[in-house]
Amino acid sequence: DIVLKLFYGVFEKENVITRAARLENHGETAIELEKMLSFSMDLMYENYEMIYFSGRHAMERTAERIPVQHAKVEIGSTRGTSSHHYNPAVILCEEGAGETHGSCIGACLVYSGNFVAAAQKDQKNQTRFQMGIHPTNFCFHLEKGEAFDTPQAILSYSGTGLTKLSQQYHEIIREHICRGAYKHAKRPILINNWEATYFNFNEEKILKIAEQAQKLGIEMLVLDDGWFGKREDCLLYTSDAADEARSVD
């Protein structure tokens, strides 16, 4: 009555396999789905390390590295967003692997919500590696005939270190996820006034920045926070375009 389908995509050029799963309710009653991951992988090698990425403003995607042992190693986010605070991408590499040597397996979710990634040795020192939507606060109601699809996971392997793995992810994301006119073109250059002025700006200051930027070949100026209403510091409210512009015409 319940059917699980596994979906694999093979991108030979990029050395990537994608994996997702679908659960279909063909029964007569509704079900509550409380946990469903994008992949679960069993590995024979004994001594893995997990590399994951956390961070904050001005210190984005800081790599941290910990050994995988019999106690479960688990990272994730339940904030509803991922971004550079806790990135939904992890690497499982052999002990001591570096940029140009050692085997490593990457896993990246095409999803920016709550996620979990876990690895653990079993009693025979084999490693189970899993990743998907975080089960905390997750409950999906499936009526008869309905289905649930997990986010897609992008899996890649390198036998020659982390640099090759990174390059393979660059390629798959550039070729198959990035969209728009600038997918394979140089992007226009823009300048943002925020770090130069913060909230303290007027028309004269903005025009001076624009004039200097134009001389350098910069093609666009982005007017940042503070152009609307009475927002003169970070403690005041944010607003929208309906507010009267306070500093520039």
Regions found by a protein language model. Give the residues of each.
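Terminal connector regions
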Residues: 162-176
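Conserved, mostly hydrophobic/aromatic
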Residues: 21, 145, 191
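Short acidic, Pro/Gly- and aromatic-enriched capping/linker segments at domain boundaries
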Residues: 127-141
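Short, basic/aromatic beta-hairpin or loop at an interaction surface
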Residues: 119-129
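Short Pro-Gly-centered flexible turn/kink motifs
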Residues: 140-159
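Single conserved hydrophobic/aromatic residue that forms the stacking wall/gate
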Residues: 237-249
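Polysaccharide-binding surfaces and accessory modules of carbohydrate-active proteins
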Residues: 1-120, 136
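Aromatic-lined carbohydrate-binding/catalytic grooves of carbohydrate-active enzymes
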Residues: 184-239
